[in-house]
Swiss-Prot record:
Keyword Ion transport: no
Cellular component annotations (GO), alphabetically ordered: nucleus
Originating species: Homo sapiens
Main location: nucleus
Top-level taxon of the source organism: Eukaryota
Protein name, UniProt field: Zinc finger protein 266
Biological role: May be involved in transcriptional regulation.
Lineage: Eukaryota, Metazoa, Chordata, Craniata, Vertebrata
A GO term for molecular function: DNA-binding transcription factor activity, RNA polymerase II-specific
């Protein structure tokens, strides 16, 4: 059924495949309903109105219509009125009115005058070429047409990107992606498209219904094949399994994309910031960050997002409970992927392994972040001071040191924080919770980082060394802070007097000289202090006084 379509694509014709296939299927089903060709008459009329979708796509009307009238009684044949050609079999119905040459080989006629030229060559008896590798016959030179399909040769190269194509028309279509040319515009939304097939798909999203409904969740689909794929999410049928980590998927394309997480392949690169992606759709979504486009808006609170998935996640914040619950510990999550990632904590599975040091991770995103510790890559740069970060979240936190923004506020005491994790740790002061316990001495802490720091007190090791002077430290944060001595960096600037500081605690102490804040108060005499060190020195004086008395 698709042989003729493939021949057209080979010689450079860009066709709308979904419409073509659906037309063939409809005609085939009608033929079966009519019964045997030997016992019945048939009549088909293809009018311009039936080709309305093609007219919408190409922007111009097709031929005025193709009318075929005939009957099949013994040796009678079908007469194609459009060109007077005679077909020896009724398969022209299934192949969009094929034309015939003396050797009973057929070519597609439906998609316009250009291909009629090829048909005329067959009608006049012009010598046809047969490609020996597959046996297919063409009016054109087989070295130009069929050989490229069978051997995979791509003779047309793009000078900008180096990408290769089988024929010249495909190269021409690709070149439009570089200059941004949009030849086909959809009037309903004003959006432009490079290829007519892309426009046709867009028209379907606007016009077509979704007749195939899932009985489990009610979700609708345009094609039955999409519904069958979707059903795998309910039945748990994941036939496509990754040989590296064992993760299974409902679609082969999902497995193909997943494999890139193991190979590290990221062929789609952003021209603005250089960030690379494994999937083209992720690059398209990323580009919205640069243009500031946020088409998905929450009707509840008005917050807009660049991705529909982000809006879906956000909408769950308006509901009372996260729908996906872990059966082992009872923790709830907003989506199934987060639950799957969490479940690896209980199973201990860490499928993502670092090629440099062998460290394994439960999530691919954690491996990506870890890999930057080896490569030194810091793609996220602060526009204010030029400081670069390995993670976008770290850049967001850093920018708040310039703006002074503290969006996370404690409901108990009103204290605000620039980072959400700091608020979470602060809340444990009110609850008294200390979930992180040292296995060596039993001491408990409110933060995991505090426990990690404490664990190094049991060891004399100082694994983190300054590259400038060789000084060793127990903690990586201490190295980063120490480096400011060599670089002279002072990222914390006072808005009142303009003075700058290398460290946040020095900056906070300085701010109190302007505000007059003295949060540390002595319970014995009521005297208050702006710094904890001054407060501790004062307490020691009271202790000495009690001893001397």
């Amino acid at each position: 059924m698709l042989e003729n379509y493939k021949n057209l694509a080979t010689v450079g014709y860009q066709l709308f495949k979904p419409s073509l296939i659906s037309w063939l299927e409809q005609e085939e089903s009608r033929t079966v309903q009519r019964g045997d060709f030997q016992a019945s008459e048939w009549k088909v009329q293809l009018k311009t109105k039936e080709l309305a979708l093609q007219q919408d796509v190409l922007g111009e009307p097709t031929s005025s219509g193709i009318q075929m009238i005939g009957s099949h009684n013994g040796g009678e044949v079908s007469d194609v009125k459009q060109c007077g050609d005679v077909s020896s079999e009724h398969s022209c119905l299934k192949t969009h009115v094929r034309t015939q040459n003396s050797e009973n080989t057929f070519e597609c006629y439906l998609y316009g005058v250009d291909f009629l030229t090829l048909h005329k060559k067959t009608s006049t008896g012009e010598q046809r070429s047969v490609f020996s590798q597959c046996g297919k016959a063409f009016s054109l030179n087989p070295d130009v047409v069929c050989q490229r399909t069978c051997t995979g040769e791509k003779a047309f190269d793009c000078s900008d990107s180096g990408k290769s194509f089988i024929n010249h028309s495909h190269l021409q279509g690709h070149l439009r992606t570089h200059n941004g040319e949009s030849l086909h515009e959809w009037k309903e939304c004003g959006r432009g498209f490079i290829h007519s097939t892309d426009l046709a798909v867009r028209i379907q999203t606007h016009r077509s219904e979704k007749p195939y409904k899932c009985k489990e969740c009610g979700k609708g689909f345009r094609y039955s094949a999409y519904l069958n794929i979707h059903m795998g999410t309910h039945t748990g049928d994941n036939p496509y399994e990754c040989k590296e980590c064992g993760k299974a998927f409902t679609r082969s394309c999902q497995l193909t994309q997943h494999r890139k997480t193991h190979t590290g392949e990221k062929p789609y690169k952003c021209k603005d910031c250089g960030r690379a992606f494994t999937v083209s759709s992720c690059l398209s979504q990323h580009m919205k960050i640069h243009v500031g486009e946020k088409p998905y808006e929450c009707k509840e609170c008005g917050i807009a997002f660049t991705r529909s998935s982000q809006l879906t996640e956000h909408l769950k914040t308006h509901t009372a409970k996260d729908p996906f619950e872990c059966k082992i510990c009872g923790k709830s999550f907003r989506n199934s992927s987060c639950l799957s990632d969490h479940f690896r904590i209980h199973t201990g599975i860490k499928p993502y392994k670092c090629k440099d040091c062998g460290k394994a991770f439960t999530q691919n995103s954690d491996l990506t972040k870890h890999a930057r510790t080896h490569s030194g890559e810091r793609p996220y740069e602060c526009k204010e001071c030029g400081k670069a970060f390995a993670r976008s979240s770290r850049l967001s936190e850093h920018t708040r040191t310039h703006t002074g923004e503290k969006p996370f506020e404690c409901v108990k005491c009103g204290k605000a924080f620039a980072i959400s994790s700091n608020l979470s740790g602060h809340l444990r002061i009110h609850t008294g919770e200390k979930p992180f316990e040292c296995l060596e001495c039993g001491k408990a802490f409110t933060h995991s980082s505090s426990l990690n720091n404490h664990m190094r007190t049991h060891s004399a090791k100082k694994p983190f060394t300054c590259m400038e002077c060789g000084k060793a430290f127990k903690f990586p944060t201490c190295v980063n802070l120490h480096m400011r001595i060599h670089t002279g960096e002072k990222p914390y600037k006072c808005k009142q007097c303009g003075k700058s500081f290398s460290y946040s605690n020095s900056f906070q102490l300085h701010e109190r000289t302007h505000t007059g804040e003295k949060p540390y108060e002595c319970k014995e005499c009521g005297k208050a202090f702006s710094s904890s060190s001054s407060f501790r020195n004062h307490e020691r004086r009271h202790a000495d006084e009690r001893l001397s008395a």
